[in-house]
Design a protein with these regions (language model features):
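Active-site segments that bind and position negatively charged phosphate/pyrophosphate groups
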Residues: 155-240
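ATP/NTP phosphate-donor binding region
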Residues: 1-53
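Structural motif
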Residues: 1, 55-57, 117
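A glycine/threonine-rich phosphate-anchoring loop and its flanking beta-alpha core
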Residues: 71-166
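A short, small-residue-rich loop immediately preceding and capping a beta-strand
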Residues: 47-69, 73-82
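Short glycine/serine/threonine-rich phosphate/pyrophosphate-binding segments
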Residues: 7-10, 34-37, 61-67, 86-90, ...
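Alpha-helical scaffold segments in soluble metabolic enzymes
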Residues: 13, 39, 43, 68, ...
Length: 240
């Protein structure tokens, strides 16, 4: 499943790397809706040629759609993010919207993606605002984790189980990396450079934030975000 924004530039390289493997490319429809999930599920479950692996190449909504389809079909999940704008790649959840971009629900899955592959050069080549949005999303991880810990709120993301100390430690590390390397990384990304700080922020935006929110839960920041999606003026804004 390929995001149309990167299909022309990245799809040929992906196809070449999968020489000898039967591959079918589907272009993402632009919104993670139930209808789009149904469409991709049907494509992946075609009788006689059902997909063994679903690969998602693109941003968070492309990734969430592919994850939902993989869960429905039993296929393995390989995630290839082309931007570091959210912590969707590593998580076992998908955020579903309606056709107008209004938040509908969050789907929770029984398993996480099998593999996440990120090329820092691809991330740096994307518009810097996506990288900044990923920092914004990841910045909420520690504060929401701490909020849940201090209020002794169970982790609803994980079905009501208590938080883990390891999860809270990861959320704290995520925050520390963002504060230490965030500004340096943004300067580098705007200059088109891949530096150690950039690679650290890619890890924080994607892995540390993903593990942090799944093991500690979300709180006010994401609740306010979900409500704001009901305003038409917010539909062009990024999640972070």
């Amino acid at each position: 499943l390929v995001d149309p924004a990167v299909a022309d530039s990245l799809q040929p390289a992906l196809a070449a790397g999968l020489d000898g493997v039967t591959v079918r490319f589907e272009r993402f429809g632009g919104e993670c809706t139930h209808a789009e999930i149904d469409r991709i599920t049907a494509a992946a479950a075609t009788p006689g040629s059902a997909a063994e692996v679903i690969v998602a190449m693109g941003g968070g909504k492309t990734i969430d759609t592919a994850k939902a389809a993989a869960i429905r079909t039993g296929a393995r999940m390989v995630i290839v993010p082309t931007i570091a704008s959210t912590d969707a790649p590593c998580s076992a959840v998908a955020v579903v919207y309606d056709a107008h971009g209004v938040f509908a629900e969050t789907l929770r899955f029984s398993r996480n993606p099998d593999t996440v592959v990120m090329d820092p050069d691809v991330i740096v080549a994307a518009p810097p605002r996506f990288f900044a949005a990923g920092i914004g999303d990841a910045l909420s991880t520690f504060f929401e984790a701490r909020s849940n810990a201090e209020s002794r709120t169970d982790n609803y993301v994980a079905g009501g189980f208590p938080r883990t100390l390891a999860g809270l430690a990861i959320a704290e590390t995520c925050q520390a990396v963002l504060r230490r390397d965030g500004i340096k990384a943004m300067i580098a990304v705007r200059a088109g450079l891949c530096t150690t700080a950039v690679e650290n922020i890619i890890e924080a935006n994607t892995l540390l934030s993903g593990l942090g929110f799944e093991n500690c839960g979300c709180s006010a920041a994401h609740g306010i975000h979900d409500a704001l999606t009901r305003l038409d003026e917010t539909h062009g804004l990024l999640h972070g």
